[in-house]
């Protein structure tokens, strides 16, 4: 099966939290099981540095890093990689399924839109980012109304990390 993983940051950018580690571990395991795994991510390493390797293969996973507009924004969970969106539009139809890590991101909107356009099933894994109870509540509510509710509605599956997260859906 050809699987595309979409995540804002990927190893060695471990400072960006759980989605980095989970997407990496899931990708490694899928590759070990014989699946063709590709990861689309940004070039963010941390708030000051970028990973200057646009394409690489690690542990059976093809990793493509797209330039994000600002590492400072990425450090605030606002990574934006326009070239990734353009590439998704062109090639998402080559995949059997898309696994999207994170919920409120530019990459998520693009991946969901193009997967839906080409009738490619997508799995959405918010990694605990669904609740609006923490900072930026107003912005999160706007995102949810404009994009988020549709992203959830059209997902083939949604992965929750806890019983509490299940209740948020």
Positions of predicted regions on the chain:
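Structural motif
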Residues: 96-97, 157
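Nucleotide-sugar donor phosphate/pyrophosphate-binding loop at the beta->alpha transition
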Residues: 121-123, 131-154
